[in-house]
Amino acid sequence: MIDLSPLVRRLAGTPLACWSQGLQAQLQAKLEKGHGDLERWRGALDALPALLPSEIDLVDGLRLDCDCDDGTRAQMRQALMGLSPWRKGPFDLFGVHVDTEWRSDWKWSRVAPHLDLQGKRVLDVGCGNGYYQWRMLGAGADMVIGVDPNWLFFCQFQAVQRYLPDLPAWHLPFALEELPANLEGFDTVFSMGVFYHRRSPIEHLLALKDCLVKGGELVLETLVVEGDEQQVLVPEDRYAQMRNVWYLPSVPALERWLRRAGFSDVRCVDVSVTSVEEQRSTEWMRYQSLGDFLDPNDHSKTIEGLPAPRRATLLARK
């Protein structure tokens, strides 16, 4: 049983107080529906050793440590491996280095210098396993709620949270569509790596805006293409072997969409081509990764002949 009463207490007196009252029942209904692998993943969580971190670093990475013996480390490693594949990270947990598919710390180092999260109430949409939530706390956020309907990511978050139970981070296994309309309760809303999976991009921007307080900030990170404000790529079928990629706008086009959705102070703070060093297969994620999805003779193109992944981060104000 995951007790959300600390979250309810945290949200008392905020615009999110009313919403928080129904979260425990909403979570319980989701858990009862469950997932075929949930029991196995819960078994991995139960196998984690009971440890109290004496060192916690959420600023320069995500590292927890304490004095523990090799047997305990082996137990930790085996339990964490039971929650594979690990996509976002890396995590250093009591001497076990979880070398995830993505070097999410690289993305964070590109995005974080442009943000002021001090004292902010934050929503991370499509939060994955919560890696960025912990980094947001490290950057001074007052509290962070992540939503992502993927059950494995939910369990991976629980694995870290059991060693940081008093920190104000919560992962709810919900889709953005399961949040009420017009929440208007978050100072900062993140949508990183979600936008291109949405069939209706403007609707997504409007839904994100609805979650923000007036004057709140959106952090939008997504795949883009080069070009002017009329340039948008809609893949015929797959993009880098992904079926569920719909719209890859140019940065000027995306800036226009944000303004059209009612945002102001729109600006692009980073554009980076994703390298095979930043996204790759590892011991902790053994499936195919970016290197398998690019043209083997020309890494500037995907295997389908489309422009290789290029990601931009934009900030905008409600």
UniProtKB/Swiss-Prot annotation:
It holds the Pfam family Methyltransf_9. It is an enzyme of class 2 (transferase). Gene3D superfamilies: Vaccinia Virus protein VP39 (3.40.50.150). The keyword tRNA processing applies. It comes from the Bacteria. One of its GO terms (molecular function) is methyltransferase activity. It catalyses: carboxy-S-adenosyl-L-methionine + 5-hydroxyuridine(34) in tRNA = 5-carboxymethoxyuridine(34) in tRNA + S-adenosyl-L-homocysteine + H(+). Its EC number is 2.5.1.-. One of its GO terms (biological process) is tRNA wobble uridine modification. Keywords: Transferase, tRNA processing. Carboxy-S-adenosyl-L-methionine binds at K88, W102, K107, G126, L176, E177, M192, Y196, R311. CDD domains: AdoMet_MTases (cd02440). PANTHER family: METHYLTRANSFERASE (PTHR43464), TRNA U34 CARBOXYMETHYLTRANSFERASE (PTHR43464:SF95). Homotetramer. HAMAP family: tRNA_carboxymethyltr_CmoB (MF_01590). Catalyzes carboxymethyl transfer from carboxy-S-adenosyl-L-methionine (Cx-SAM) to 5-hydroxyuridine (ho5U) to form 5-carboxymethoxyuridine (cmo5U) at position 34 in tRNAs. Belongs to the class I-like SAM-binding methyltransferase superfamily. CmoB family. This is tRNA U34 carboxymethyltransferase. It comes from Pseudomonas putida (strain W619). The lineage of its organism: Bacteria, Pseudomonadati, Pseudomonadota, Gammaproteobacteria, Pseudomonadales.
